[in-house]
């Protein structure tokens, strides 16, 4: 009885330790994703996402600070670096200054948008996108209805065939 009790106590201690595991210990502050989109003809929208598994991540860019996700803008003259800081369980802070080529990515996003006539938004674009969206939604709905119809008819056929077999 005694060894079993000791074993149970040890297992409960190990379980409590794994439940208190801090994902911020393994978090890499340089592993962030950046998304770019044209905001105006000169300003570029930037979305920086870092570590959803770690709540104590702070992202700072151009005097804006936010947890895990920061939506900001970039224009010529704004710094091309952002800071990611992670607070450890002991209170220590790891800081990483990440430099990124905002100017090149924003130029590329603007070029692609203008290349395919997606920027600047116009009444014609909005109408075209709305029509395309409605047509795709109708097509997907029709496809779903056909699939459900085929599923029901084949099940009924298979059920009738099984009943007729001796």
Curated annotation (Swiss-Prot):
The keyword S-adenosyl-L-methionine does not apply. One of its GO terms (biological process) is symbiont-mediated suppression of host antigen processing and presentation of peptide antigen via MHC class I. A motif (Di-lysine motif) lies at residues 162-166. Both disulfide bonds are absolutely critical for the interaction with MHC antigens. Glycans are attached at residues 31, 63, 67, 97. Residues 1-19 form the signal peptide. Residues 20-131 are lumenal. GO terms for molecular function: D-mannose binding. The keyword Secreted does not apply. Keywords: Disulfide bond, Early protein, Glycoprotein, Host endoplasmic reticulum, Host membrane, Host-virus interaction, Inhibition of host adaptive immune response by virus, Inhibition of host tapasin by virus, Lectin, Mannose-binding, Membrane, Signal, Transmembrane, Transmembrane helix, Viral immunoevasion. Pfam families: Adeno_GP19K. It is a single-pass type I membrane protein. Binds and retains class I heavy chains in the endoplasmic reticulum during the early period of virus infection, thereby impairing their transport to the cell surface. Also delays the expression of class I alleles that it cannot affect by direct retention. Binds transporters associated with antigen processing (TAP) and acts as a tapasin inhibitor, preventing class I/TAP association. In consequence, infected cells are masked for immune recognition by cytotoxic T-lymphocytes. Belongs to the adenoviridae E19 family. This is Early E3 18.5 kDa glycoprotein. It comes from Human adenovirus B serotype 11 (strain BC34) (HAdV-11).
């Amino acid at each position: 009885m005694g060894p079993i009790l000791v074993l149970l106590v040890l297992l409960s201690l190990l379980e409590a330790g794994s439940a208190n595991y801090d994902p911020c210990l393994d978090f890499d502050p340089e592993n962030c994703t950046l998304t770019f989109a044209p905001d105006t003809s000169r300003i570029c929208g930037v979305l920086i996402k870092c570590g959803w598994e770690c709540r104590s991540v702070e992202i700072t860019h151009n005097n804006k600070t936010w947890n895990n996700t920061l939506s900001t803008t970039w224009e010529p003259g704004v710094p091309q670096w952002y800071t990611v800081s992670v607070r450890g369980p002991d209170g220590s802070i790891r800081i990483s200054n990440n430099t990124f080529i905002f100017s090149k990515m924003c130029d590329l996003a603007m070029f692609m948008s203008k290349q395919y006539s997606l920027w600047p938004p116009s009444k014609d674009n909005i109408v075209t996108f709305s029509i395309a969206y409605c047509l795709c939604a109708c097509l997907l709905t029709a496809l779903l209805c056909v699939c459900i119809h085929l599923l029901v008819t084949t099940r009924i056929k298979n059920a009738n065939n099984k009943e007729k077999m001796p």
